[in-house]
Amino acid sequence: LLLKAKTDGRWHTQEHLEKNVYKEYGSILAASKGLTVSDNGNESVPMDMSGHKYSGTTAMMLNIASHNQGYEVPVFLNLATMNANGIRVNENAVAIPVITKNGVENVYNIDQTDYPMKHPQEYSNMKLNQVLESRLSSENKDAIESLVNNNRFTTKTSFDSSVGSASYSAIDNTIHVAPVGEYDKKDGFLQDLSEGLVMRTRKSEPVSSRFENILKEGLIVHLGSGLVGQKYGYDVGETAGSKFWKERLKNDPNYTKAVIKAAERSSDKIIDYVDKLQKGQSQSSNLDMRSTTPIDIDVDGNGIVESDENLAPDKKQGADEEKDNNQEESHHQHRHFHR
């Protein structure tokens, strides 16, 4: 099938197109067994036909989709590329909508097209290149761990927890993880550590004991850890709470968008923090979210849009702020999520 892009009509407004993207992202996440999954330690970031690599959430979603569908080569083509090169999509193939700098576009994996049949040698070379190309160097993979071991983070790390039970204590500004020797793989330790760092960025969020809010916060931590893992080349697997939020992800694109945007803010802050530390630039201890601009969606159904929730701690000024914060922190000393 030779496809043509349709760009007019009520179902092709930017808002509607983006809603479809997050609906698809929710379905991809709900079907996943992990956020970053590599084969024998080697994995290439999804890319387009010209070799340009996707990044961030888009790369994560295409990576998960490749594993969910069993695609052998993580190369994705948009309609313009396929039409320009006379590539036809297979019958019944379903596109994945993604958000790019040019807006929303539909992409197909190269395995969904006639390219492998028309150009077997070129396709074989693509597969070989994917096997040979390690997604990230081991030096990059060890970036976060080396900074912790050398006490370069302003946030303290205490190795007194159990595997899969990372937590963050706001009272003493400490991330708690298990000793690295207790993990079967180093990736598990790095996942716990990055989850603790994401919790650290979320410390100024209002604490709520509502079950749905706790699950949402756990999902944000999980996705944020996945984005950090994608950057530094370690696997992030499933979480124990996934069965509770998978149905919500499949059916509520606003919820999916809210948690993804929150995870992006946290992971971007951590990656920027690590990058500057690696370059020897001094960093403050303010690894939190107060300077970010969240989206205006009430995903919890509590009558408060997300931006008001995120900024709520900043609305208390003067002497009452310290009192309120101390009461909050004494009641919720740890943000603690289990896998």
Put a short name on every predicted segment:
Residues 1-294:
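N-terminal accessory/interface modules of nucleic-acid-binding and processing proteins
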Residues 304-306:
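Generic structural signal for well-ordered beta-strand positions
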Residues 1-4, 8, 289-293, 297-302, ...:
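Non-Sec secretion/translocation targeting segments of pathogen effectors
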